[in-house]
């Protein structure tokens, strides 16, 4: 039996492939193998001989099976190593192209506005988008019968029956932030208030939600001349022109007196807007001297301090500067549109390096 063991273990050690291993298995431990034939002879032996030969044959069979399995695993590992040495995989293929995000034109316009007015000493203030009707209307000298307070123009928040809290609205302008700024900071004061506002209107040039920036300057002896200079410098910087002509038209806003709508001289030759030249006029904002009642509502003595205010539609200015024809496209969430009109997110505007590059 020792000779049989040495014979098959030697063959297993010299086997070069799985076919040779299988042939050895069949010859040694297969149904017709040499060890199987020897186990059939156990029945012809005496009980004493079987007690000795049986365990010895089983041990030999187990040892040969273990040697076969180990050799088979070794051959498989060797084959894998050879395949890894011979095969070549290109791992330098380019990665999937990932598009960079861009800054929305409204966000860009807001950053440009902020940069310009910051150079003039204005700080930025923000306020709640849901506000009481006192801040949105009463404090701004807008009487109860004014059309702007009608439900067809203003979004009122629902109040349950018996709710005694003051009515709340989605703010129709950012002017309420002026009142809150006066209450918080007092005078003198120079502040701009950019943000989203809401009105019940929807067409090519109006949306239920849009963006405004309000400006407020309070000090002793402020006049319309200060307002005119501020707006001229702003328009020149925003549209990046050396000279601009503004036209102030008398108007009426409850929160300013006197009030003026401001037009800029422009040209539409060839369908392209050119600021500061031509014979056309384009309305861009409303302005005026702050009404004494509004100053008083902010907790400041109107006999001591005067000021000017202005309101600018950020969306409208973005349309004019960037050549965007339809206001509604701002809110369509179209990535193709945003890739075309968007701006580099990290290219922050400033007056020295340029606003929109």
Curated annotation (Swiss-Prot):
Chief place where the protein resides: cytoplasm
PROSITE patterns: AA_TRNA_LIGASE_II
Residues annotated to bind Mg(2+): 257
Top-level lineage group: Bacteria
Protein family per UniProt: Belongs to the class-II aminoacyl-tRNA synthetase family. Phe-tRNA synthetase alpha subunit type 1 subfamily.
Binding partners and assembly: Tetramer of two alpha and two beta subunits.
PANTHER family per UniProt: PHENYLALANINE--TRNA LIGASE, MITOCHONDRIAL (PTHR11538:SF41), PHENYLALANYL-TRNA SYNTHETASE (PTHR11538)
Protein name per Swiss-Prot or TrEMBL: Phenylalanine--tRNA ligase alpha subunit
Source organism (scientific name): Ruegeria pomeroyi (strain ATCC 700808 / DSM 15171 / DSS-3)
Gene name of the encoded protein: pheS
């Amino acid at each position: 039996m020792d000779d049989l063991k040495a014979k098959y273990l030697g063959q297993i050690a010299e086997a070069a492939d799985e076919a040779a291993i299988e042939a050895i298995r069949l010859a040694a431990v297969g149904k017709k193998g040499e060890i199987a034939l020897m186990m059939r002879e156990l029945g012809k032996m005496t009980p004493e001989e079987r007690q000795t030969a049986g365990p010895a044959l089983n041990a030999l069979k187990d040892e040969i099976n273990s040697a076969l399995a180990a050799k088979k695993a070794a051959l498989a590992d060797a084959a894998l190593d050879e395949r890894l040495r011979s095969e070549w995989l290109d791992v330098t293929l380019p990665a999937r192209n990932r598009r960079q995000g861009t800054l929305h034109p409204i966000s860009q316009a807001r950053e440009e506005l902020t940069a310009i007015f910051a150079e003039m000493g204005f700080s930025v203030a923000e306020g709640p988008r849901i506000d009481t009707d006192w801040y949105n209307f009463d404090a701004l000298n807008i009487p109860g019968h004014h059309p702007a307070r009608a439900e067809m123009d203003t979004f009122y928040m629902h109040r349950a029956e018996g709710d005694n809290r003051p009515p709340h609205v989605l703010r129709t302008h950012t002017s309420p932030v002026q009142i809150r700024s006066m209450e918080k900071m007092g005078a003198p004061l120079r502040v701009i208030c950019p943000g989203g506002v809401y009105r019940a209107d929807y067409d090519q040039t109006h949306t239920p939600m849009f963006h405004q920036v309000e400006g407020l300057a309070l000090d002793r002896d402020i006049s319309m001349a200060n307002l005119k200079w501020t707006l001229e410098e702003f328009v020149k910087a925003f549209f990046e022109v050396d000279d601009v002509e503004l036209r102030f038209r008398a108007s009426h806003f409850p929160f300013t007196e006197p009030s003026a709508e401001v037009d800029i001289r422009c040209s539409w030759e060839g369908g392209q807007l050119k600021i500061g030249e031509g014979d056309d006029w384009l309305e861009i904002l409303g302005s005026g001297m702050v009404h004494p009642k509004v100053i008083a509502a902010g907790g400041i003595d109107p006999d001591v301090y005067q000021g000017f205010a202005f309101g600018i539609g950020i969306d409208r200015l973005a349309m004019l500067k960037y050549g965007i024809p339809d206001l509604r496209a701002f809110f369509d969430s179209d990535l193709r549109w945003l890739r075309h009109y968007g701006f580099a997110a990290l290219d922050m505007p400033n007056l020295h390096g340029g606003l929109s590059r």
